[in-house]
Structure formats: C-alpha cells, structure tokens
C-alpha cells in the first residue's frame, strides 16, 4: 500500500445494513492499515529498511481497532470469551453502530490529524443505521469498547527501553545505520505471552558445525544476486514475498456463508494480537543473538574457522538485506503464526485455496496455494532465495509464530459453551 487513499473512497464501502456485514469489519481493518502505512511514510518495499514509528503505540493501533470491534460486537452477539472482561450490552443494539464507532474512536485516538476525514465518513456510516434508539445504544457500546481497547496492550513502564548499541572492537568502524527495531520493541505488555523471551529459540548452530556450513552454502549458492542455481520463478517468488498481502485469504474467510460479524472481528483481533506478540518475540531473539546476515558472513567466510565454507568478498544478495540481526527469520515467524490462526479458522486446506498477493511487486496477481503449510514453506524458502536468511533461521522463526498462535488459540477469546452464549437476533 503506497500512501493513504482518500478517506471517502475507503469508508464509503462501510455503509451496510444491520446486522454488521463482513465488509464493515474488513473495510475498517483495511482503512486502519492504510492510515498506518501513510503515518509511517514507508512504501511497501522498504518497510524492512525504514525505522519504525517513533510513537510506539502506533505499532499496535491496528490490533486495537480489531479488538475494539470484537469486544463491541461480542457484547451484543455473545459467542466468545471477552479478552478485556467487557460486559454484555443491549441485545437490541445496532451491531453496525457498535462496530463502526469502536473502530472510529480508536483511529481518532491514534490519528488525530485525520479527524476531519474520520468524522465525515463516520457520520456517513452511522446515517445508514435507521433506528435512532438502536444506533445510540450501539454507539455507546462502541465507545466503551474503544476505551477498553486503547488502554490495553501498551508499553510496560517497568521494562527498561535500552537503545541498540553495535558490538565492535574499540576503534573499529561499523555501519552507522541503527536497526529498525526501536528500544520499545520488547517493552510492550504481551497480548498472549508471559514475556517477550518466553518462546526464544535456542542459539543458531556453531560456526564450526556441519549445519552451519550446509546452510551457509545453500544461501551462498541460491541467494546471490547473480546466482545461476536459482530459477526465474524462484527469483520472482523471492521478490514477491518481500511484503506479502494476506487480505485476499482473510476476505474469503470473512465472506464465507453463515459467518457472523463477531466471528470476523474475532479473527482479525486474534490475528493482530498473535502477530504483535510474534513480532515482539522475534525481535527480542534477534537482538539477543545479534547474528550476522549472509552478506556479512559470506564476504568474511574465512573468519568462521570452518573449512567447509568458502568466502566470496564480492557476494551480494538478490534482495536488500533488512536492517536488523538475522536470527530468527521474522517473515517466517509471521508465516507460521498466520498459518496456525487461519488453519483454525478455515482448515489446513481451504476449499478456495490459500490466496496471497504482494505489495512488493506492482500490480501483483493473487497466487493460490493448496494449503497453509505450503505457504509457510514458500515463505521460508523465499528468504533463502533472496539471500537474507539461512534455513535454520527460517525453521526457528516458523516455530516462534506457531507457538504464539497455539497459545492464543488455546487460551484467549475461546468460544463459549452453548449454554453461556447469547446470540443476537
């Protein structure tokens, strides 16, 4: 996503009849993503190279939008455990008014500069709710849900935020660009995890090991800019997956016949919370191990004391190396997390396939894969084909994401027993 679409173009699609439609949820999520992209000022292709926003709370704004909509809808159409211990609301309240108000209030809190556009389009959406009493009751529920979501998942003041310091020999030059990870990266209160380091993987293989030599050679051979071992399709996939777009699959899931709005809001909220914690855990591990990227290792291959590795002082990766430590792979942890959540939502091999697009290739077509595990394997391999990750790092990252997602699915926002549910009419 490059830049912010005019708010009217985005939010006009939010007008829906009661009860709230899948499009209401999807479009507000999409709108939140566009606001975040515009606020960060980064294009889709350079997000791994551009520092994160200085306002730490913005990094979790999208999750709070989804969480607020979930709590507002779940208060009316009670099907799940509340994450925020949010009380039940009026069964006759407008679900549209509740969901739209919840999203609007969260976005207004985090993006006050967009107040005029947000207010204008919020009013348009609310006008579609014809019953004044139901609209007002829904509005009040949405406002309360937004306040609850805004207050959750913030920075923990008890955690020290220590700026990154390059490790080097005194007097020796190192690159001066600091990693994209800000000091607040590991200072959030986790949504799911006990602590940021609770799923930290073991260390990368010893530089003198056979595993190191094998994975080093694989990325050297396949991931070089001028590699002759990589096929044209593999080159395309390495670039295609720099910034994957999962919205095609999420929309297919949301549009499935018989799904209630609260189910879709829960899907987006759970996904956001899992990805936030996965990102935090992956960042914590990266900063802990501070492991070198292939471009550094391969150019200095003689320094690892492994006779099975060959140095190539002129080696360059196919794609730009992200500006943070290598181990574990963040793309792979995200892929593992998404696969676990979506398998729970639509099955391991959804009838419509796993549909993904790309924001790193202009006008990218939607790719359809048979299963979520196929998609994870493709993402993992793409990072080696791009010359930025080793296979062992891909595997470690995937396991982080899967662990976080499984913890979430087993512990939060679970379906209520039928006797405790109160479904909206």
Task: Briefly describe each language-model feature range.
Residues 17-19:
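N-terminal signal peptide c-region/cleavage motif recognized by signal peptidases
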